[in-house]
């Protein structure tokens, strides 16, 4: 979740449902149960395909459900995670993953009056630069912001800042 892990998404899918196809079916059922009716998953990792799509509203619905889970919020709020990995020969090494959300890592300034809780970035050629994010304004009100199809990373954060500032007046 900090940085996209397509291999991990496939491993989780196979572990939970026995196969990617069975997991994707479960994802689609869950999306409909949440009310995300303009979404169809074709894989567990979000890579493009003709039958893999969603809408900004459905992303909001899915994200709103996800942030009810405290562990999810903890993960999306994490700047860097370091794990010790041991290979089959017993040799251990550390591996770190950085959050791809530049507001969380401090590589982009947080808008005045906001606390960034966390979010998830995504980037593909077709979708452009995307960010779904939870923050709080100066009144402590939670704000979910969604930017899709930004034409560059810096523009993604500029658009997100502009959206957030509309909620701090």
Regions found by a protein language model. Give the residues of each.
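Penicillin-recognizing serine hydrolase domain
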Residues: 18-169
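Substrate-binding clefts and substrate-entry loops adjacent to catalytic sites
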Residues: 2-15, 42
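Generic alpha-helical segment signature
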Residues: 1-2, 20
């Amino acid at each position: 979740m900090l940085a996209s892990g397509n291999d991990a998404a496939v491993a989780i899918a196979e572990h939970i449902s026995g196969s990617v196809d069975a997991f994707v079916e479960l994802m689609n059922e869950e999306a409909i149960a949440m009310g995300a009716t303009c979404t169809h998953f074709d894989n567990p990792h979000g890579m493009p395909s003709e039958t893999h799509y969603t809408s900004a509203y459905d992303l909001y619905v899915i994200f709103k459900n996800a942030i009810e889970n405290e562990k999810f919020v903890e993960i999306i709020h994490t700047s860097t995670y370091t794990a010790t990995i041991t290979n089959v020969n017993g040799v251990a090494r550390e591996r770190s993953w950085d959050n791809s959300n530049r507001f969380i890592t401090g590589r982009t300034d947080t808008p005045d009056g906001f606390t960034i809780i966390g979010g998830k970035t995504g980037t593909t050629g077709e979708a452009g630069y995307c960010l779904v994010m939870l923050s709080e304004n100066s009144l402590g009100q939670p704000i979910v912001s969604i930017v899709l199809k930004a034409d560059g990373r810096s523009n993604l954060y500029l658009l997100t800042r502009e959206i957030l500032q509309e909620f701090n007046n």
